[in-house]
């Protein structure tokens, strides 16, 4: 039995990052809502290999009546507990400390980078720091996101970290191995965050690092076979990483019981339809049905500008096509999708208590209630980098596994406002030029292409026209935005600092080769506050 960590979710949009950091250390983790049955927690710890518990952040305030609390059993099972942000506040409140809102303290809410003084006398932080001051104090560069603060430590706790604006930024009860931080060690903005979480998991909880992707494959294959039995599965294939890996995993489990349906909705990347068919016929050997649905999708999207409405229309059309195709396949009872963790967390409003909805994804937010197929989502607990690792372990070619992510709604959410065939054609050509130049431009330091150095890159069509000059004439044409980001987990991201020469070449090619576009801009927004996709 593998050692495990239980994560109780209080509604944070980055709870899954905690699980990712734990898994980075080759320890299995599970996420459950904070108000799950206490018996589940007891069994997880006492019967299923659980070695520790982490309490996530969340949007609530412990100072408000009826706010979430951790089940009391968490503090009675004799295992280490780590509280993060809201998790720290509820731990302090439940164990006898005090918490106050920023307003009551006459302070502003704290959001963004901060420097925390680490008190290194605790087992958790000893020796972990980014730099030290002239007085010898260890300093951590961290990410804060809170309004409330702990003002009084519980009687058995001591101070573990502090800032000027947050005097109690960390606390510890070493005897019971209870620890808590006001900052977020799970996000990449906290430089030593991974080291802190791995210290907690490996040294405090004493978990053995023995969970590997091979174990996940074996478990997933067994689960798929149990779920599906002798029934057949239909999978919507886009050619992207997620659906490709899902197809490979399901095919390994049930072979020819899987039929992939590739829906060409006219919103794919340039020439992608032909490439998808060739790739899967050559590499996977699975049954693939190609459906030309361009006119259907364009007709349904005509006049629709709202991004949520577009996503739901696209999701609905996908499902209806799958249902029509499944009627032609004997014993087809399941619809498989490449839903992954970030899809689920960003669609938090659909079943996640306390979380704030950001956007819905076509995989999880646009499905009709009367869907006639059961849902199979074998990747829904994996992050993007884990999906890639799984793809390699399944034997998929690198060019398939490391292709940049592409949204299920395709260019439908990269064309802002109403979707038209004319706009899709312009965007396809501009995007192809951008990706081609990223692949062809090598960074002198790393000797890698800028395509490999970016996690996701694409063009966005803006439904506005700008004045330009070409030759001796005035132009009044459309604008395209370029977006390129670097990220480890797609939950947070930094904009990519592409060479100006590369951006200049992309601009020149788009302006000269794509008639109808006369202006190109580059998006330098990070996530947060922006999302990676524009819609």
From Swiss-Prot:
GO molecular function, one term: GMP synthase activity
Species, as recorded: Polynucleobacter necessarius subsp. necessarius (strain STIR1)
Pfam families hit by this protein: GATase (PF00117), GMP_synt_C (PF00958), NAD_synthase (PF02540)
UniProt-listed NCBIfam families: guaA_Cterm, guaA_Nterm, PRK00074.1
Pathway: Purine metabolism; GMP biosynthesis; GMP from XMP (L-Gln route): step 1/1
Description of how the protein assembles with itself and partners: Homodimer.
Taxonomic lineage: Bacteria, Pseudomonadati, Pseudomonadota, Betaproteobacteria, Burkholderiales
Gene: guaA
Disulfide bonds: none
UniProt domain Glutamine amidotransferase type-1: residue ranges: 4-210
Record-linked PROSITE patterns: GATASE_TYPE_1, GMPS_ATP_PPASE
Entry EC number(s): 6.3.5.2
Keywords: ATP-binding, Glutamine amidotransferase, GMP biosynthesis, Ligase, Nucleotide-binding, Purine biosynthesis
Protein name, as recorded: GMP synthase [glutamine-hydrolyzing]
């Amino acid at each position: 039995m593998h050692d495990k960590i239980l994560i109780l979710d209080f509604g944070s949009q980055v709870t899954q990052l905690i699980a990712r950091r734990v898994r980075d250390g080759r320890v299995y983790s599970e996420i459950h809502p904070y108000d799950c049955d206490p018996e589940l927690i007891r069994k997880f710890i006492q019967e299923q290999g659980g070695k520790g518990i982490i309490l996530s952040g969340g949007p609530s305030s412990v100072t408000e009546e009826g706010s979430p609390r951790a089940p009391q059993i968490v503090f009675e099972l004799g295992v280490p507990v780590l509280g993060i942000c809201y998790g720290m506040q509820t731990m302090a409140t439940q164990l006898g400390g005090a918490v106050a809102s920023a307003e009551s303290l006459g302070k502003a809410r704290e959001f963004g980078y901060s420097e925390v003084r680490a008190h290194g006398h605790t087992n958790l932080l000893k020796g972990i720091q980014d730099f030290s001051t002239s007085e010898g104090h260890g300093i951590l560069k961290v990410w804060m996101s809170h309004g409330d603060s702990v003002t009084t430590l519980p009687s058995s706790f001591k101070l573990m970290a502090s800032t000027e604006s947050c005097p109690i930024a960390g606390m510890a009860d070493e005897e019971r191995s209870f620890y808590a931080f006001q900052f977020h060690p799970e996000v990449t903005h906290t430089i030593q965050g991974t080291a802190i979480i791995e210290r907690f998991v490996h040294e405090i909880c004493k978990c053995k690092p023995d969970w590997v992707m091979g174990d996940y494959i074996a478990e997933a294959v067994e689960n798929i076979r149990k779920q599906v039995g002798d029934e057949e599965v239909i999978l919507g294939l886009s050619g992207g990483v997620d659906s490709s890996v899902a197809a490979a995993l399901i095919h390994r489990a049930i072979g020819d019981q899987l039929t992939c349906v590739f829906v060409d909705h006219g919103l794919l990347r340039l020439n992608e339809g032909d490439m998808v068919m060739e790739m899967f016929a050559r590499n996977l050997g699975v049954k693939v049905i190609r459906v030309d649905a361009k006119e259907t999708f364009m007709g349904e999207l005509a006049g629709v500008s709202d991004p949520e409405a577009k996503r739901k229309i696209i999701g609905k059309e996908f499902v209806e096509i799958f249902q029509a195709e499944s009627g032609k396949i004997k014993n087809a009872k399941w619809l498989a999708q490449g839903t992954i963790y970030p899809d689920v967390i960003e669609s938090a409003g659909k079943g996640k208590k306390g979380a704030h909805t950001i956007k819905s994804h076509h995989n999880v937010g646009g499905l009709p209630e009367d869907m006639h197929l059961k849902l199979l989502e074998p990747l829904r607990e994996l992050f993007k980098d884990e999906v890639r690792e799984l793809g390699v372990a399944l034997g998929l070619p690198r060019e398939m596994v490391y292709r940049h992510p592409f949204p299920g709604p395709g260019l439908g959410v990269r064309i802002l406002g109403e979707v038209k065939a004319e706009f899709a054609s312009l965007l396809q050509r501009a995007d192809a030029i951008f990706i081609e130049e990223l692949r062809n431009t090598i960074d002198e330091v790393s000797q890698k292409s800028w395509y490999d150095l970016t996690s996701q890159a694409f063009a966005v069509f803006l439904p506005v026209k700008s004045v330009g000059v070409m030759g001796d004439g005035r132009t009044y044409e459309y604008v395209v935005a370029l977006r390129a980001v670097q990220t480890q987990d797609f939950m947070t991201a930094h904009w990519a600092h592409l060479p100006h020469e590369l951006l200049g070449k992309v601009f020149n090619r788009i302006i000269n080769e794509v008639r109808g576009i006369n202006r190109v801009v580059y998006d330098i927004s990070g996530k947060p506050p922006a999302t990676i996709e524009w819609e």
